[in-house]
Amino acid sequence: MEIPFPTLSVALPDSSLIDSKSLLEKSLRVAQFARALSIFRVEKVYVYHDASSTVRPDDAKLITLLLEYLDTPQYLRKLLYPKMKLLQFAGMLPPIQSPHHKKFLRASEIRGEESRAGVLLRDRGKWVVDVGLDRTVPFVGKTETTRKANFKLSVKQGQ
């Protein structure tokens, strides 16, 4: 029997990067935060401005962007994040290996039902989902997002 984890939220001040001078140092520090947040299965992170300190105005944006980037499975990162200066060192950061980060698979390796993070795409007039398989899979259902979402995959009998 699996014991459910309680919902855990964390508030993170933008001043947590005040001692880091370079973008590389800041990126590495945020990666450490992401790893700790993943280990303790934190579900929500609130980044807030610490008015009592003199922080750079883009530090909160950097923390938020890097945490979202690191929370995205590796197979979706190129689709969701264009090249930008704030992500200059993101490729050097270690993956956080979160439970919802699934490995790349062949579609034939899916057994039963599986939940995977993916992105809804339009391909030749039809909706398909990129969920880190060797091919996109047809999308059945309704959605209002083309950003990252969780999708339930199920294999039909005989496939």
Please tell me what each predicted stretch does.
Residues 1-159:
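Post-transcriptional modification and biogenesis factors for structured RNAs
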